[in-house]
Each structure stands twice: as C-alpha cells, then as structure tokens.
C-alpha cells in the first residue's frame, strides 16, 4: 500500500511519541512492504507553525527531512497537478495544507494516514483494519 502521512502524524514521529499512534498505524507506515511519504506541504506547515512559536516539532527544522528519510519515508513535492486537483467528495475542512494533502493522495493514488477526526472520514483517508 502507498501512504501519505499527514502533518499530525509526522509531528508525532519527529517527537518520537509513537505511543500516541495506534500500533497498526506504526506497523503499516514503517513496514518495508508499504511505501510511505512525507509531503513538502507538511514540512512547510511545520516550519510555519514552529517559526510562529506555535509548535515544537522535537527536532531542528533543518533536521526533519533527513530524519524522515532515515526512518524510511519518501519525500513528495507539490506539483501543478496537486495544486489544481478538485476533490470529490469535497473534504469537510478548509485548511489549505490538509486540502493539498488530499489532492496529492488523489493524484498519486495514496491513502492519507491521519489522526485528525475531520480528515479521517474522507474516502482518501486510510483506516487501520
């Protein structure tokens, strides 16, 4: 399976607080059988919130890309197809970062791994069995 981790999941991973995630999420995301991605959109959101003093990601911002790569995550850039993708059904959220993550899932055939209740109801979100 191919997963895109949302910002909240990436923050939990960066802080090394795996106990905050369902064990099935950790197993699926870190399994060599699956491909898991971290979006540039999420890193951008983390950087903005950190610089505004609203978030402590647990690592220096410059260290995040290397850390995510070290734990087996692939990076996903934002491209034009992601930027213009309309979503069906419309997500129940207005946050532009969440919307671009869903657009990336739709374009790249990924499933969104999230702990955000508002996002978890969208058909592009993955629910552990």
Report residues per predicted region:
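Short, well-structured N-terminal submotif of metal-dependent ribonuclease cores
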Residues: 1-38, 52-66, 108, 117-120, ...
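Generic structural signal for small/hydrophobic residues in well-ordered secondary structure
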Residues: 6-7, 46, 86, 105
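Alpha-helix capping/helix-boundary segments
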Residues: 9, 42-43, 82, 101, ...
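A short acidic, helix-capping loop that chelates divalent metal ions and anchors anionic groups
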Residues: 11-12, 47-49, 84-87
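Residue-level signal for well-ordered alpha-helical positions
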Residues: 16-17, 49, 89, 125
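Short glycine/serine/threonine-enriched helix-capping/active-site loop
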Residues: 38-41, 78
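Active-site neighborhoods of divalent-metal-dependent phosphate/nucleic-acid chemistry enzymes
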Residues: 56-58, 62, 69-115, 124, ...
């Amino acid at each position: 399976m191919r997963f895109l981790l949302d910002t909240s999941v990436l923050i939990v991973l960066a802080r090394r607080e795996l106990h905050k995630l369902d064990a099935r999420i950790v197993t699926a995301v870190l399994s060599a059988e699956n491909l898991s991605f971290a979006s540039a959109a999420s890193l951008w959101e983390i950087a903005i919130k950190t610089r505004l003093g609203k978030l402590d990601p647990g690592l220096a911002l410059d260290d995040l890309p290397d850390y995510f790569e070290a734990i087996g995550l692939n990076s996903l850039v934002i491209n034009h197809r992601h930027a213009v993708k309309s979503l069906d059904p419309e997500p129940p959220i207005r946050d532009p970062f969440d919307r671009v993550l869903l657009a990336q899932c739709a374009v790249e055939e990924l499933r969104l791994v999230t702990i955000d209740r508002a996002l978890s109801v969208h058909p592009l979100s993955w629910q552990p069995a």
